[in-house]
């Protein structure tokens, strides 16, 4: 009877990660927009440059461990060896050259891929104002006069200028197949410029944890033809609901897994209202603090004046007492 090898199953278990990872979609390495393609090139280039150092180190570590193993009595032993100009040149020169190249690439790509930098194109861009809520995305099209929740559309080969803010905690706006992510924060506006090189439906996500409904805070980004975009706008304008500053408080209430929702019209001032209401809140707090501080200062000054008056009164009483106690000169 042969004994079962407890390690025999490990070689089959080692295939499990490959099988599981086979179902994963490498979204970042399958970009559908120019910004995403440039970022993929940057990631691959930087990784290959670093592998110039990493791979030789791994190979030499394994080679030296094998060559100088205890059973290899033929390996040359040099106990007095301590320096080599060639080795010093390689271990210093190669990393320095790689760092210099990476530095140049970083400088160039940082400016080229700046999310605030408008994309070079002769086509008029589409402007979309994005607001992160709990737990959904509100999108306003100021030029078309419409708004949506958890769905956007735009023509392919057309720059899309996103103006992003938050009406809740800090969040992050991200369409992985199109390019960069950018944070959304209450009381301030961030910008992002993207473009789709082909038609398709791309997943948009929140890339920053924001509470219980975070996992369902997803939206669809539809890149279509110019005619397809106009048809989509017409469909939204046919929706029965509208969005105004008065009805907005109902929308902003926390909700999870919200389906795409259309608003046929939207108040032109809504995005500005969302953007500035936290600034006014800060001003009000500052004014209240100033009034409180002024009241404290006035009370302190009043108390100080009263203390001075009390001291003067006590001094006057002391002087009168001294006068009564002095003997008369006639006596």
From Swiss-Prot:
Lipid attachment site numbers (S-diacylglycerol cysteine): 24
Gene Ontology CC, one term: plasma membrane
Top-level taxonomic group: Bacteria
GO process annotations (BP): ATP synthesis coupled electron transport
SUPFAM superfamilies linked to this entry: Cupredoxins, Cytochrome c oxidase subunit II-like, transmembrane region
Stated name of the protein: Cytochrome bo(3) ubiquinol oxidase subunit 2
Family from the record: Belongs to the cytochrome c oxidase subunit 2 family.
Function: Cytochrome bo(3) ubiquinol terminal oxidase is the component of the aerobic respiratory chain of E.coli that predominates when cells are grown at high aeration. Has proton pump activity across the membrane in addition to electron transfer, pumping 2 protons/electron.
NCBIfam families: CyoA
UniProt membrane topology term: Multi-pass membrane protein
Origin organism lineage: Bacteria, Pseudomonadati, Pseudomonadota, Gammaproteobacteria, Pseudomonadales
Stretches in topological domain Periplasmic: 24-41, 108-331
UniProt keyword list: Cell inner membrane, Cell membrane, Electron transport, Lipoprotein, Membrane, Oxidoreductase, Palmitate, Respiratory chain, Signal, Transmembrane, Transmembrane helix, Transport
Subunit structure, interactors included: Heterooctamer of two A chains, two B chains, two C chains and two D chains.
Residue pairs linked by disulfide bridges in the UniProt entry: none
Membrane topology (Cytoplasmic): 63-86
Residue numbers with lipid attached (N-palmitoyl cysteine): 24
Single GO molecular function: copper ion binding
Coiled coil (UniProt feature): none
């Amino acid at each position: 009877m042969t004994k079962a090898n407890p390690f025999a199953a490990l070689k089959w278990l080692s295939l499990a990660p490959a099988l599981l990872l086979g179902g994963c979609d490498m979204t970042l390495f399958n970009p559908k927009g120019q910004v995403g393609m440039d970022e993929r090139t940057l990631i691959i280039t930087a990784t290959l440059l670093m592998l110039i150092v990493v791979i030789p180190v791994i190979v030499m570590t394994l080679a030296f461990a094998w060559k100088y193993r205890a059973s290899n009595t033929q390996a040359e032993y040099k106990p007095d060896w301590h320096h080599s100009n060639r080795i010093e040149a390689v271990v210093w020169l190669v990393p320095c050259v790689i760092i210099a190249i990476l530095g140049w690439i970083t400088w160039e790509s940082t400016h080229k891929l700046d999310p605030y930098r408008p994309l070079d194109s002769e086509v008029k861009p589409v402007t979309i104002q994005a607001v992160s809520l709990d737990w959904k995305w509100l999108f306003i099209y100021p030029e078309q006069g419409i708004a949506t929740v958890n769905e956007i559309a735009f023509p392919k080969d057309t720059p899309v200028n996103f103006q992003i803010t938050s009406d809740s905690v800090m969040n992050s706006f991200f369409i992985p197949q199109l390019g960069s992510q950018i944070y959304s924060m209450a009381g301030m506006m961030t910008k992002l410029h993207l473009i789709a090189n082909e038609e398709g439906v791309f997943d948009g996500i929140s890339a920053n944890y924001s509470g219980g409904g975070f996992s369902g805070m997803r939206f669809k980004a539809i890149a279509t033809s110019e005619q397809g975009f106009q048809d989509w706008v017409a469909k939204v304008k046919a929706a029965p609901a509208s969005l105004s500053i008065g009805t907005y408080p109902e929308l902003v209430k926390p909700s999870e897994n919200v389906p795409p929702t259309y608003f046929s019209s939207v108040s032109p001032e809504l995005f500005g209202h969302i953007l500035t209401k936290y600034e006014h809140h800060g001003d009000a707090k500052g004014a209240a603090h100033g009034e409180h501080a002024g009241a404290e200062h006035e009370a302190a000054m009043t108390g100080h004046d009263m203390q001075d008056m009390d001291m003067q009164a006590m001094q006057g009483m002391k002087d009168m007492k001294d006068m009564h106690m002095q003997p008369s000169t006639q006596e």
